[in-house]
Design a protein with these regions (language model features):
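Short, well-structured alpha-helical segments
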Residues: 50, 108, 112, 147-154, ...
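Hydrophobic side-chain positions on well-ordered alpha-helices
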Residues: 22, 27, 117-121, 138, ...
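Short linear motifs at protein or domain termini
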Residues: 1-101
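C-terminal all-alpha effector/ligand-binding and dimerization domain
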Residues: 7, 164-200
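Amphipathic alpha-helical repeat elements characteristic of tetratricopeptide repeat
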Residues: 13, 89, 105, 109-112, ...
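Hydrophobic, amphipathic alpha-helical faces that serve as interaction scaffolds
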Residues: 87-102, 132-170
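Amphipathic alpha-helical segments enriched in hydrophobic/aromatic residues interleaved with Lys/Arg
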Residues: 107-125, 180
Length: 200
């Protein structure tokens, strides 16, 4: 029987999830400095779990340590984006292929839930919708390790999506819905080649 999580572990995970969400949604902007004392005051929690959470964020490549200065949200580096996009493409295509080979009829039918985007014009809602669609496919690929890695990469794309949309002259988000419908249509039709091609 597994023991219950220690309070410090729970606090660390709570802080980690909060800061991770703020980074991925660009509420903490690329290049923004983070100080332990400021986070202690803002989150109302002791320094130890905050330090643990910051260490985990550094390990995930979301922040960097600046000796004697504190922590900084990592900048979005063009070469890093290119590498991440290539990795995501490989992972998502494999997830689609495996899902089409192994998923039940019910799992495939539930893809239709993503055919219509949320009515809210709120950007975070749309980003949640986009992430939920892609992580659903990953979660049902039948390979737990692949799913875990793919979902982490997909979630890290949230802030890239946020930056690309908000910096574009065209703020239309209809492309998410259109792309999802095309992928869903190909999967439901059993056209693996087309579904994989659309993932790119």
């Amino acid at each position: 029987m597994q023991s219950a999580e220690k309070p410090r572990d729970l606090a660390r995970d709570s802080v980690y999830q909060e800061l991770r969400s703020e980074i991925l949604m660009c509420r903490l902007r690329p290049g923004q400095m983070l100080q332990e004392r400021d986070l202690v005051a803002r989150l109302g929690i002791s320094k130890s779990p905050i330090r643990d959470a910051l260490l985990k964020l550094e390990q995930r490549g979301l922040i960097e340590v600046l000796p004697r200065k504190g922590y900084r949200v990592r900048q979005i580096d063009i070469s890093d984006v290119r590498d991440m996009y290539g990795l995501r493409l490989i992972l998502e295509r494999e997830c689609i292929s495996l899902m089409m080979d192994t998923a039940s009829k019910d799992v495939l039918e539930r893809l239709d839930d993503f055919a219509e985007a949320p009515s809210s014009p709120d950007l975070p809602t749309w980003i949640d919708y986009n992430r939920a669609f892609h992580t659903y496919i990953a979660a049902h690929c039948g390979n737990a390790r692949l799913a875990m890695i793919a979902q982490e990469i997909i979630e890290q794309f949230d802030r890239l999506t946020y930056v690309s949309v908000t910096s574009s002259d065209d703020l239309s988000l209809d492309k998410f819905e259109r792309e999802h419908r095309e992928i869903i249509g190909a999967i439901r039709a059993g056209d693996k080649r087309q579904a994989i091609a659309l993932a790119g």
